[in-house]
């Protein structure tokens, strides 16, 4: 099930980024101790009461023909297009402006829920000065103060009231839900077409739960797959291709609905920072991952080329050290058969459970080989561990003091668990918890 997307829209300097940071709080920072992943602050996740959602901050829209403003407006339109609910922000101190009215006209055409937020209402006496904003035609304005955090509860209540109840994907539990992600022009579309043309049976094209997404069902060697949002991967256009910050919205929706994510790289162009950012989304969502190096046919190769490229990937994607790597050519339909065993194994490991007794034997042996650390004279004591979840496999380790388990020792225990049980293709989570 995908989380709703909330876009914050308005002219410059009305306080959009301040409200964005208020809503997402510390979630704007990266998952702790995840080296090598960068997170763009323009997009993050938020929580309100029982609701999880994604929120996107957009650039300020102005009445100008400046070239950069054309790009900002295009980016905002993409964010609006992908959003389920829009927060339209205005500024009480500056009053209603012509630009506000222009943005309102743009939002009328979307036929989407719009919640009007009047920012910089820093004390109750100022609430009487917001009535001019009724003229924008979006109903009751919600007075807020980004700098003081006032009024956010009422605003988010109204935002959440506009979330649609979305049903889970109606796919069999054994069906592997698969998405492809990667920066523009790495060959995702070609890979989709090549996969669907490789000894497959297409069952049907059906509408996914994500608005206007098309999923494609197919089978390979008695395993059913669903390729999530093939329409999104095939969607072209200079605006989407050139505004990567915003076009990731659709990719993130696909990731949320997937079991396994194929991170597609370009063998010819090599690895760039954007590749790591895109891959980081799949890792942070806890999805099983297979790294796919496409366009392998374009390289002049010798016996060492593949090993050198793999070493480079391991160096650049340290946070994905669990992910297997496949080298393929979608264009030439080379080595595509190597993908499916990796996808299937990653999916199985993503759902794997281990017995507590065997797990604790592994933990005990690990501690005997490498004793727990000390800090200021206090030694970490590990009492026992248990698996509490799958997708991804998640383990709680009960200890005397959770703060004594440093990242390096947590990583050591993870490696020992991997050595004992496998888990190739899936992240695993280890949560230290103080025993009561």
UniProtKB/Swiss-Prot annotation:
CDD domains: EngA1, EngA2. Residues 4-167, 176-351 form the EngA-type G domain. GTP 1 binds at residues 10-17, 57-61, 119-122. GO terms for biological process: ribosome biogenesis. Pfam families: KH_dom-like, MMR_HSR1. Keywords: GTP-binding, Nucleotide-binding, Repeat, Ribosome biogenesis. GO terms for molecular function: GTP binding; ribosome binding. Residues 352-436 form the KH-like domain. GTP 2 binds at residues 182-189, 229-233, 294-297. InterPro entries: G_ENGA (IPR031166), GTP-bd (IPR006073), GTPase_Der (IPR016484), KH_dom-like (IPR032859), KH_dom-like_a/b (IPR015946), P-loop_NTPase (IPR027417), Small_GTP-bd (IPR005225). It comes from the Bacteria. Belongs to the TRAFAC class TrmE-Era-EngA-EngB-Septin-like GTPase superfamily. EngA (Der) GTPase family. GTPase that plays an essential role in the late steps of ribosome biogenesis. HAMAP family: GTPase_Der. Associates with the 50S ribosomal subunit. This is GTPase Der. It comes from Staphylococcus carnosus (strain TM300). The gene is der.
């Amino acid at each position: 099930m995908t989380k709703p997307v909330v876009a914050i829209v308005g002219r410059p300097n009305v306080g959009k980024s301040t409200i964005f940071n208020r809503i997402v709080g510390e979630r704007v920072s990266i998952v702790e101790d995840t080296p090598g992943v960068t997170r763009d602050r323009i997009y993050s996740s938020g929580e309100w009461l029982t609701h999880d959602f994604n929120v996107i901050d957009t650039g300020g829209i102005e009445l100008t023909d400046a070239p950069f403003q054309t790009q900002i407006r295009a980016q905002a339109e993409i964010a609006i297009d992908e959003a389920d609910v829009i927060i339209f922000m205005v500024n009480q101190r500056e009053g209603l402006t012509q630009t506000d009215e222009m943005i309102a006209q743009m939002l009328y055409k979307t036929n989407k829920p719009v919640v009007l937020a009047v920012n910089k209402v820093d004390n109750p006496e100022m609430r009487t000065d917001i009535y001019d904003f009724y003229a924008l035609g979006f109903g009751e304005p919600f007075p807020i103060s980004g700098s003081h955090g006032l009024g956010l509860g009422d605003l988010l209540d109204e935002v959440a009231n506009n979330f649609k109840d979305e049903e889970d994907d109606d796919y069999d539990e054994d069906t592997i839900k698969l998405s492809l992600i990667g920066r523009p022009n790495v060959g995702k579309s070609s890979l989709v077409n090549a996969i669907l043309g490789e000894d497959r049976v297409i069952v049907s094209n059906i509408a996914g739960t994500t608005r206007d997404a098309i999923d494609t069902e197919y089978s390979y060697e008695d395993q059913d797959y669903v390729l999530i949002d093939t329409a999104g991967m095939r969607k072209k256009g200079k605006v989407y291709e050139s505004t990567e910050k915003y076009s990731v919205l659709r990719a993130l929706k696909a990731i949320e609905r997937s079991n396994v994510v194929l991170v597609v790289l370009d063998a010819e162009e090599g690895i760039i920072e954007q590749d790591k950012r895109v891959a980081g989304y799949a890792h942070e969502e806890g999805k099983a991952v297979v790294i796919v190096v496409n366009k392998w046919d374009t390289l002049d190769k010798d016996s060492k080329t593949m090993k050198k490229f793999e070493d480079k990937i391991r160096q650049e994607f340290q946070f994905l050290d669990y992910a297997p790597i496949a080298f393929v050519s979608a264009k030439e339909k080379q080595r595509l058969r190597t993908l499916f065993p990796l996808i299937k194994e990653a999916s199985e490991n993503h759902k794997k459970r281990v017995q507590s007794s065997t797990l604790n034997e592994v933990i005990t042996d690990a501690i005997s080989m490498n004793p727990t650390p000390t800090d200021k004279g206090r030694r970490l004591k590990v009492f026992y561990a248990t698996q509490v979840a799958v997708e991804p496999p998640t383990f709680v380790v009960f200890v005397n003091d959770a703060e004594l388990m440093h990242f390096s020792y947590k990583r050591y225990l993870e490696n020992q668990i991997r050595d004992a049980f496998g888990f190739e293709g899936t992240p695993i989570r280890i949560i230290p918890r103080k025993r009561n």
